[in-house]
Amino acid sequence: GIVFNGSPLFTGDSGSGESEIRKWIIENDWLESVVSLPDQLFFNTGISTYIWVVTNKKTPQRKGKVQLIDGSSFYKSMKKSLGSKRKFIDDSQREQLLQIYQNFEDNEHSKIFDNEFFGYTKVTIEQPKVENGEVVRDKKGNPKPDSKLRDSERVPLSEDIEQYFSREVEPHLPNSWIDFNKSKVGYEINFTKYFYQYKPLRSSDDISQELLELKKESENLLNLIMD
């Protein structure tokens, strides 16, 4: 395994060096697992880190798959900090993480995805250039693109690009088209997104009640000071 910070998971657009490295590793089916570790594990930095498990000898059940493991909650607090290091992973927690890895199952701490789940095609959306109310055309009669209106979309590799365009883009930009010559495939792993758990917002009544209670506490403290 290799320990990285979060940047190599997602930094760089399609076609960039970072994305091309991810693409190379994933399309060759070498990425077996990514394990998120707790923050504040290291002496010189408090940032979160990730272990990339890379191999060219995947077992049959792991072929074409990537296992993500959220190990961010597996830690004990140190009695005394050492620089930025305030947490450690004890033996029992290491065993738990190893067991999660070996079980290769979807659960609270483990998510399993097909390789292509992390890939997308960045497509360029063009719109016609208009001058004096008329669409400007080239010698073949095709509309010329307006670079000022140029946009892009990320289409998951699991989706058909034409169908995505018809569903998501064309209804809003009926005169637009895709310039397939500019399409590029990229890969990213948005780790926290896959383990996100929605927490309902507190109601306004609860917040108002808490503010009233805090106000009363403040008034009582002020009265004690004045007395």
Residue ranges and their predicted role:
Residues M226-D227:
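Short acidic DE-rich linear segments
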